[in-house]
Amino acid sequence: MQLRCPICGKPLVRIERSAVCENRHSFDYAKQGYINLLIRQSVDHGDNKAMVQARTAFLHSGSYEFLRNTICQIIQEEPCNTLADLGCGEGYYTSSFPVQEKYGFDMSKEALKYAARTDRSSQYTVASIFHLPLPDDSMDVCVTCFAPFADAEIQR
């Protein structure tokens, strides 16, 4: 599945450590492996490092393991090849989903640094869940855990 340029909507093609569209809009992959497709750059998008560390510690305490396991069971009940986790944070849920192609989207670079470093089985992208860089009808399943519900994007 090809991501779409957040500026013009054309498909992005990976060329070494960048993704480029036919209109020559270019986006670099971070050394951790995620790509930033958020158009408006700001230092305070999403969670900061301390918030990510606190949530990661809490999630790894096992408090929400039952929820993660339940979601995985539901996903396994239907054939599913592609999944988008909207507001994926540090990838706690994304990394465990039993799907071949997994995509995590979040506005927090700090969260995605952690996610991409610890989960090489998923593709992580800094992007707004209300303006996803995905082609129409490209995902079998969309999951949102403790993030705003982007109904229009999920339906698309």
PLM feature spans:
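Short catalytic micro-motifs in class I SAM-dependent methyltransferases
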Residues: V141, F146-F149
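N-terminal auxiliary segments of SAM/dcSAM-dependent transferases
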Residues: M1-H45
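Glycine-rich helix-loop-beta junction characteristic of Rossmann-like nucleotide cofactor-binding loops
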Residues: C72-P79, L132-P133
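Short loop/turn motifs at secondary-structure junctions
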Residues: P79-T82, S138
